[in-house]
Amino acid sequence: MLDLGLSKMALIGVVALVVLGPERLPRVARTAGALFGRAQRYINDVKAEVSREIELDALRTMKSDFEQAARNVENTIHDNLREHERDLNAAWNSAVSSGDPAAADASGGLGATSDEPSWRTVAAAPAKRRNWRVKKTATPVWYKRATMRRTQVQSGAARVARHQPSSLRRPARFF
């Protein structure tokens, strides 16, 4: 910025005193100080905004890197699962086709749906629940109260009137 020392500031003050006079100098000095302070605040705001944008950009790149790493891990896990499933299906099919009586009974007992039985079809349990009431009775009452919609909505004035003692109530006047 500007290199203003004490001697230069004193020289500027003397010139301003001579040019402006002692009556207007304090008002001009206050105005100049206010403008200088406003300029400093503006510069500090711009610096803060730039640093926030830089941090935000760094966070965005970090987020994208993290998401990419998560996708890579997910793809690796899915690939490994598919490979193991293929191995299990191959072992199951070889055991069924070789005439192993235990495997043949197991696949015939549950009724495999496809021509090529898989280890999943044998291990799969029936998905439908026999008693649909089990789900409703398993939900706690406090959860039902907290999540259900209110069916009896009461205004604030009605709520105050309901809980106000009868000794404090005003008598109702009808015309």
Swiss-Prot record:
Keywords: Cell inner membrane, Cell membrane, Membrane, Protein transport, Translocation, Transmembrane, Transmembrane helix, Transport. Residues 99-115 have a biased composition (Low complexity). It is a single-pass membrane protein. Its main location: membrane. The gene is tatB. Pfam families: TatA_B_E. The keyword Transmembrane helix applies. This is Sec-independent protein translocase protein TatB. It is found in: Cell inner membrane. GO terms for biological process: protein transport by the Tat complex. It comes from Burkholderia thailandensis (strain ATCC 700388 / DSM 13276 / CCUG 48851 / CIP 106301 / E264). Part of the twin-arginine translocation (Tat) system that transports large folded proteins containing a characteristic twin-arginine motif in their signal peptide across membranes. Together with TatC, TatB is part of a receptor directly interacting with Tat signal peptides. TatB may form an oligomeric binding site that transiently accommodates folded Tat precursor proteins before their translocation. The Tat system comprises two distinct complexes: a TatABC complex, containing multiple copies of TatA, TatB and TatC subunits, and a separate TatA complex, containing only TatA subunits. Substrates initially bind to the TatABC complex, which probably triggers association of the separate TatA complex to form the active translocon. Residues 99-118 are annotated as: Disordered. GO terms for molecular function: protein transmembrane transporter activity. The keyword Protein transport applies. One of its GO terms (cellular component) is TAT protein transport complex. The chain crosses the membrane at residues 1-21. Belongs to the TatB family.
